[in-house]
A protein has these predicted regions:
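Glycine-rich, histidine-containing beta strand-loop boundary motifs that form or position
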Residues: 40
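C-terminal beta-strand edge segments of enzyme domains
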Residues: 157-244
Length: 244
């Protein structure tokens, strides 16, 4: 994670989607027979983008997403923002699963996970690079709960600048099927150290839960939410460094 102040240096660090760097990961996914999500500084004009690409277990590229909510108050003011949120079907051992992605600061906005849910996402992948503490982890739990989606977050480990590990996965199933009460949606929370952590999403149970519970898109009233798409901002939310 490195965004130099010098634009020439920044562009020199960026790599294309179809270049040698990404080809190495594509071949690795194909060789190991696993899906791989890769984050990278993508070559783009006028400025590079913070991008994640998902390869399936055959090495086929199935999803590209560039971070929509760039941190314009920090060093990401030197990056281009992405245009939209995307989903894709991924072949897994449990059959086809619809995957969406959002990157780090995107999770601060409920709209990010919401639009992915509306586009059919069942599991949302969240590459992350910041301290994961109770408030940010609670955000992810809430995104899973309110959209009835799985959320899998991968954070840089302790030792990287401003990072502390604590990657998490939530399945979004907040209530037991037998009506006996609520349950903890957390599948796993990693420690601070780098490692391989396995999260087993009960996809059939998640789908059944979505068919019967009241969250997600079941009872929304989008006709009442017109102000959500207004571009007007008023105090106290005016920020001079906010880009369009």
């Amino acid at each position: 994670y490195n965004i130099p102040e010098d634009i020439t240096e920044l562009k020199a660090l960026a790599v294309p989607r179809d270049g040698e760097f990404m080809e190495a990961f594509r071949k690795t996914a194909q060789r190991l027979g696993i899906a791989v999500a890769v984050t990278y500084l993508e070559s783009f004009e006028p400025l590079p983008r913070n991008t994640v690409t998902l390869f399936d277990s055959t090495g086929r590229r199935v999803l590209d997403y560039s971070k929509v909510h760039t941190c314009d108050f920090g060093d990401e003011c030197r990056l281009s923002a992405g245009e939209e949120f995307s989903t894709a079907e991924l072949d897994t051992a449990s059959g086809k699963v619809t995957i969406g992605t959002m990157i780090c600061y995107d999770r601060e906005f409920p709209e990010s996970a919401r639009i992915l849910m509306l586009k059919g996402a069942e599991i949302i992948l969240v590459p992350n690079a910041c301290p994961m503490e109770i408030n940010r982890i609670s955000q992810l739990r809430a995104r899973a709960y309110e959209n009835m989606v799985g959320i899998a977050t991968v954070n840089y480990p302790y030792g990287k600048p401003d990072c502390n590990g604590h990657s998490t996965a939530f399945d979004g199933i907040a209530y037991r099927v037998d009506g006996s009460g609520s349950r903890n949606t957390l599948i796993i929370e990693a420690g601070e150290r780098e490692g391989i952590y396995l999260a087993d999403f009960p996809i059939d149970d998640m789908r059944e839960y979505r068919r019967r519970e009241v969250h997600g898109n079941a009872y929304r009233r989008p006709e009442k939410y017109g102000l959500l798409i207004s571009e007007e901002r008023m105090e106290p939310f005016i920020r001079p460094d906010r880009r369009k």
